[in-house]
From Swiss-Prot:
Function: Catalyzes the decarboxylation of four acetate groups of uroporphyrinogen-III to yield coproporphyrinogen-III.
PANTHER family (UniProt xref): METHYLTETRAHYDROFOLATE:HOMOCYSTEINE METHYLTRANSFERASE RELATED, UROPORPHYRINOGEN DECARBOXYLASE
InterPro entries xref list: UROD/MetE-like_sf (IPR038071), Uroporphyrinogen_deCO2ase_HemE (IPR006361), Uroporphyrinogen_deCOase (IPR000257)
Localization terms from the record: Cytoplasm, Cytosol
Superkingdom classification of source: Eukaryota
Chief location bin: cytoplasm
Key word Ribosomal protein present: no
Annotated residues for binding of coproporphyrinogen III: 44, 46, 48, 93, 170, 225, 364
UniProt-recorded name of the protein: Uroporphyrinogen decarboxylase
Pfam families the record matches: URO-D (PF01208)
Gene that this polypeptide is encoded by: Urod
GO MF, one example: uroporphyrinogen decarboxylase activity
Pathway stated in the Swiss-Prot or TrEMBL entry: Porphyrin-containing compound metabolism; protoporphyrin-IX biosynthesis; coproporphyrinogen-III from 5-aminolevulinate: step 4/4
Any one GO cellular component localisation term in the record: cytosol
Length: 386
């Protein structure tokens, strides 16, 4: 066989240079394979509840940490030093994409992210700079590659992005919103411009996720955190088509990267199907508040569906069927319970979900005051429940 694309060849060599994975339970669960134990990781497992993170933040502002691979890796590693987690997730933020598109994003203490010059009208879309956006996000790829080596194969590394609707909401509202009323108004007032906006974001997201996979991400999560503001009809209009396009376009691109034949020598896997696994990462969709559309989510082609805490996992399994992995879905507020009560809740959650095709997690990111002991209890309970 002959090499048709040197870039593809170099990509595969780069991916194979990473240390071999020692704990692959997360990836096995996502693929529906037998696991040694129920894998567990926690959304926002790296962050403000850890004193070592707070110390680092005294020296560096939030986005400096995100943009500096050494600092991003340090924060990513912090929870792994404390807890027996089955995954790491690169420290970053979904709003790096609006930044790369030319918008200013500031992190205000006690408020959260603020975009001082939001997109108010369709005319403002001209301010966005999608050309070259990926080149302004390479620091994330650098952090992912660095982190894969620092992990030394301990656990898989997850990359992530915000979904188009969620990013559009922040960019229109100028930050977080309890209603997303301005963004929702676009769906009715500017339907064609909304489509153009969402397509623009989708295309940048696909570029961004492809870069993360090539950098070394072994799983990807797409955060549709603002789905809770959409009715089912609105979700199927303003979210679902773009989530589908992300998956389809990404898989198509990554598949094409390894279609050119490569030499079957000892430095490469022994067949094309194994080669594909190097590039086609497993995909998680987490659409918070979109329990009304689980069936539709199950038809998008994602490997894992994340559940928020309002969804009964038994009912979710009945809806999505046996061939999709579920992730979640402990109420983050339960992390403030007494240890014995938390242990009972976590154990009950795992019993409901079972050991097959399940990843234990919370139903949304944990909050800044989460007790460290609660993380210890959750991880231990998830591992020992079955």
């Amino acid at each position: 066989m002959t090499i048709k694309n040197n870039n593809n060849n170099n990509t595969l060599k780069h991916l194979q240079a990473f240390p071999p994975l020692k704990n692959d339970n997360l990836l096995r669960a996502a693929r529906g394979e037998v696991v040694d134990r129920v894998p567990v990781w926690v959304m926002r497992q790296a962050g403000r509840y850890l004193p070592e993170f707070q110390e680092l933040r005294k020296q560096h502002d939030f986005f400096t940490v995100c943009r500096t691979p050494e600092l991003a890796c340090e924060v990513t590693m912090q929870p792994l030093r404390r807890f027996d987690l089955d995954a790491s997730i690169i420290f970053s933020d979904i709003l790096v994409i609006p930044q790369a598109l030319g918008l200013t994003v500031e992190m205000h203490a006690g408020v959260g992210p603020v975009l001082p010059q939001p997109i108010c009208t369709p005319e403002d879309l001209k301010r966005l700079t999608p050309d070259g956006a990926l080149s302004r996000l390479t620091y994330v790829g650098d952090a992912i590659t660095m982190m894969r080596h620092k992990l030394d194969g301990r656990v898989p590394l997850i990359g992530f992005t915000g979904a188009p609707w969620t990013l559009m909401g922040y960019m229109i509202e100028g930050g977080g919103s309890k209603t997303m009323s301005k963004a929702k108004a676009w769906l009715t007032n500017y339907p064609e411009d909304t489509k153009l906006f969402l397509i623009l974001l989708t295309d940048v997201i696909v570029d961004y996720l492809e870069m993360q996979v090539i950098a070394g991400a072994q799983m990807l999560q797409v955060f549709e955190s603002s789905a809770e503001h959409l009715s089912k009809e609105e979700f199927l209009l303003g979210s679902e088509p773009y989530l589908r396009r992300i998956r389809d376009d990404l898989v198509d691109r990554l598949t094409k990267k390894v279609i050119p034949a490569v030499p079957l020598v000892s430095s490469y896997p022994n067949n094309i199907f194994t080669l594909l696994t190097y590039l086609i990462s497993l995909l998680i969709i987490f659409a918070k508040g979109a329990g009304h559309s689980l069936k539709e989510q199950s038809e998008l082609g994602y490997d894992v569906i994340g559940l928020d805490w309002t969804v009964d996992p038994v009912e979710a399994r009945a809806v999505v069927g046996p061939n999709i992995t579920l992730q979640g879905n402990l109420d983050p507020q339960s992390m403030y319970c007494e240890p014995n009560e938390l242990r009972s809740l976590a154990t009950e959650m795992v019993h409901k979900c079972g050991k097959s095709r399940y990843i234990a997690n919370v139903g949304h990111g944990i909050t800044p005051q989460t007790p460290i002991t609660s993380m210890e209890v959750l991880v231990e309970a998830a591992h020992n429940a079955l």
